[in-house]
From Swiss-Prot:
NCBIfam families, per database record: menH_SHCHC (TIGR03695), PRK11126.1 (NF008340)
Domain of life: Bacteria
Organism expressing this protein natively: Salmonella arizonae (strain ATCC BAA-731 / CDC346-86 / RSK2980)
PANTHER family linked: 2-SUCCINYL-5-ENOLPYRUVYL-6-HYDROXY-3-CYCLOHEXENE-1-CARBOXYLATE SYNTHASE, PROTEIN PHYLLO, CHLOROPLASTIC
Protein keywords: Lyase, Menaquinone biosynthesis
Oligomeric and partner information: Monomer.
Similarity annotation: Belongs to the AB hydrolase superfamily. MenH family.
Reactions catalysed, as given in the entry: 5-enolpyruvoyl-6-hydroxy-2-succinyl-cyclohex-3-ene-1-carboxylate = (1R,6R)-6-hydroxy-2-succinyl-cyclohexa-2,4-diene-1-carboxylate + pyruvate
Name assigned to this protein: 2-succinyl-6-hydroxy-2,4-cyclohexadiene-1-carboxylate synthase
One biological process term in Gene Ontology: menaquinone biosynthetic process
């Protein structure tokens, strides 16, 4: 089994750019940024529970990792960079730490390296369980209205919140809930030690108004790019700034 994806061909011999979206996004999320790098082949993946992969069930990160590997193999992708936002960033970090073949470098935007104690994991498990129950039972427009009131999204304007709520409400609540539980931050190991031992390039992007993830970026051995005029979702709030950072990273 493989994940649904959109494939945009580039020049042969260049490493692929493989983009992983955040929770409740889909393969379109990274395209305004990724399509600025037309010399590279690009693969925009729908993670399980999302978009064209909505019907693919997973029990945890191990299943997501195997699906990601199978998808890369199906496209004969032998050299690539992983670029992931939030949930996609966590999946990318997990894959990098497990040693996915062919990985040339890692770019993470606003991805959490992992909780560091059992109390924090228990609290997060409870919180994610409550959100999952709401995704299953309530209209998505209601749930996402509240979702975007969370502190990590304080930089969003009312208009941006409204637009994101309308966009994300096109998802399937049941499959979102299942993916949220399967890939909860509570189920993710603390990756700091493994990330700090990586031998290939590792870059971290965060919005200048995202104080939580700017602090987390200092806890991993990554080169940090701070995106001006942006909060947690930097590639949506300032796509040109993220394009500039990626161009520096990829030297394109």
């Amino acid at each position: 089994m493989m994940l649904h994806a959109q494939n945009m061909p580039g020049q042969s011999g260049m490493p692929w750019l493989v983009f992983l979206h955040g929770f409740s996004g889909d393969c379109r999320e990274w395209q305004p940024v990724g399509e600025q790098f037309h010399t590279c082949s690009r693969l925009y993946i729908d993670l399980p529970g999302h978009g064209g992969s909505a019907a693919i069930p997973v029990g945890g990160f191990a299943d997501v990792f195997q699906l990601l590997r199978a998808t890369l193999i199906s496209y004969n992708i032998l050299k690539f960079w992983l670029v992931g936002y939030s949930l996609g960033g966590r999946v990318a970090m997990m894959a990098a730490c497990q040693g996915i073949p062919g990985l040339c470098g890692l770019v993470v935007e606003g991805g959490h390296p992992g909780l560091q104690n059992e109390q924090a994991r228990a609290e997060r498990r409870l919180s994610d369980g409550r959100w999952a129950e709401r995704f299953r039972r309530e209209p998505l427009s209601t749930v996402f209205h509240d979702w975007y009131q969370q502190s990590v999204f304080t930089s969003l304007t009312a208009q941006q919140r409204q637009a994101l709520t309308a966009l994300r409400s096109q998802n399937n609540g049941e499959t979102l809930a299942a993916m949220l539980e399967a890939t909860s931050l509570a189920a993710q190991p603390d990756l700091r030690e493994a990330l700090n031992a990586l031998t290939f390039p590792f870059y971290y992007l965060c919005g200048e108004r995202d104080s939580k993830f700017r602090a987390l970026a200092q806890e991993v051995a990554a080169t940090c790019h701070v995106i001006r005029n942006a909060g947690h979702n930097a590639h949506r709030e300032n796509p040109a700034g993220v394009v500039d950072s990626l161009a520096q990273i990829l030297r394109l």
